[in-house]
């Protein structure tokens, strides 16, 4: 469970780090949002180093969690309800992530 929490925190840091520059570029927010955006991306990179597996495996498994978090962000922040296809895609991605993360060692 600790690993899944770390993946969720990593995804949140990346999404926030990308969303803040988006607010500046597309929504007219102050350029000051770039500072916490850059800090969030730095935290994201640091969090990736805390994952216990080899980097390639971490990145592959992290992709599934990122997809799930991005769809949750779509709903919570953008106010767009996910379609059944979005939910199916998340299920497939998380299934792949689970196979990679919880494989026998």
Curated annotation (Swiss-Prot):
Top-level taxon: Bacteria
Q: Which Pfam families does the entry link to?
A: UPF0060
Where found? Cell inner membrane
Q: List the keywords (alphabetical).
A: Cell inner membrane, Cell membrane, Membrane, Plasmid, Transmembrane, Transmembrane helix
A single GO cellular-component term from the record reads: plasma membrane
Q: Membrane-crossing residues?
A: 4-24, 28-48, 60-80, 82-102
Q: Which InterPro entries does UniProt cross-reference here?
A: UPF0060 (IPR003844)
Topology relative to the lipid bilayer, per the entry, is: Multi-pass membrane protein
Please name the NCBIfam families in this protein's record: PRK02237.1
In terms of HAMAP family, this protein maps to: UPF0060 (MF_00010)
Family according to the record: Belongs to the UPF0060 family.
Q: What is the name listed in the Swiss-Prot or TrEMBL entry for this protein?
A: UPF0060 membrane protein Rmet_4032
């Amino acid at each position: 469970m600790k690993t899944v929490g770390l993946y969720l925190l990593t995804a949140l840091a990346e999404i926030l780090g990308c969303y803040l520059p988006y607010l500046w570029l597309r929504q007219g927010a102050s350029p000051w949002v770039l500072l916490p955006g850059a800090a969030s991306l730095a935290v994201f990179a640091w969090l990736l180093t805390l994952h216990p597996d080899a980097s390639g495996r971490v990145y592959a498994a992290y992709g599934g969690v990122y997809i799930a978090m991005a769809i949750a962000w779509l709903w919570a922040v953008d106010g767009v309800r996910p379609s059944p296809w979005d939910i199916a895609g998340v299920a497939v991605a998380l299934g792949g992530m689970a196979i990679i993360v919880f494989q026998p060692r």
